[in-house]
C-alpha cells in the first residue's frame, strides 16, 4: 500500500469511475538494501609495513674504539617517520566513486518514502502494454492544492522493478493498483469518521459516544444539526509505510493467539502511519493515525477480503479518543444500555 505521488510533472488524470474490485490480489515484499559503502582507508594504511626498530647492540658486540653515537639512527628514524606520517590531502579525484552517485534514499519522496518520480514509459523487454492514466483519490492534500493521485499501472510496474521485484506478474498489475486504491479509500473513510467524532474535542466526542457505537451516528447527526457549523475537513499531510514494524496492538493479538486459539489471527501484511491535519478551534494540529492491513479468507465467489484496523496513534489525546470510543461502547452494553433503550422505545 501507500503508492501515492503528487508530482506536477506526472501526467494529469481526469476524474474517472473507480475500477472494479473483483478478482483482485495484493502482495507486499521488502525492498532491496541500499548500495554498500566502499572502505578504502584500511587498504591504504595496510600498504605500509610497520617499521621494526633495529635491536640494540650488546656491549660485548660493540667495538670499544667506535664512536658511541649511532650515525645510522638518523636515517632509520627518518624512514619510520615517513612511513607513519599523515599523508597530504589528495586531490578530489581520489574521492570514492560512490560519493558522486546519489544514494537510494535520496531518490525517494520524503513525504512518503516512495520514488518521487516514476516514468510512464514501458520497461525494457516489457511484453504487455499497461495503462498510463492515473486515478484521483478523494483524499485532500495537506498543502491545499487538490487531492492525492494514485499511480498508473505502468508507474506501479516501473516502481516494482526499481525496488527489485523483477519477477512481478505484469498481468496482475492492474488488479494490484485497483486493490491499492480501494484499500486506501477505505482507510481514509475510517479516518474521516474518527475526525468527525473527536475533531472538535474530547467532551464533544463523549457526547457522541456515551450511548455506544450503535447510537453514535444518530448522536453525531443530531449534534451537527444543532451546531449548524460546517465541519472542517481533515487533510492528509504525508504517510509512511512501515511493513516491518508491528504495532503494539497487532503484537498483543499475536500473543493472545498463542495462548488461546480463539484469538489466533494472521499478522497484518502491511502497516501505515498517516499524518493528518486537524482543524481544532481554528488551530492546525497534526494527528498521526495507525493502520493495520489484514487479509481474510476469500468470499465464496472468489473475491478477496481485507480488514483495516484504523485508529489514532497512542499519544495522550489519541489514547483518550480510543478509550472513549471503544470503552464507551463496552460500558453502554455492559451497563444494560441496550435493554434500557428498548424499554424506553416501547
Curated annotation (Swiss-Prot):
It comes from the Eukaryota. HRM repeats lie at residues 34-39, 66-71. GO terms for molecular function: holocytochrome-c synthase activity; metal ion binding. Coiled coil: none annotated. It catalyses: holo-[cytochrome c] = apo-[cytochrome c] + heme b. InterPro entries: Holocyt_c/c1_synthase. Its EC number is 4.4.1.17. Residues 1-68, 81-100 are annotated as: Disordered. Keywords: Heme, Iron, Lyase, Membrane, Metal-binding, Mitochondrion, Mitochondrion inner membrane, Repeat. GO terms for cellular component: mitochondrial inner membrane; mitochondrial intermembrane space; mitochondrion. Its main location: mitochondrion. It is found in: Mitochondrion inner membrane. It is an enzyme of class 4 (lyase). Lyase that catalyzes the covalent linking of the heme group to the cytochrome C apoprotein to produce the mature functional cytochrome. Belongs to the cytochrome c-type heme lyase family. This is Holocytochrome-c synthase. The gene is cyt-2.
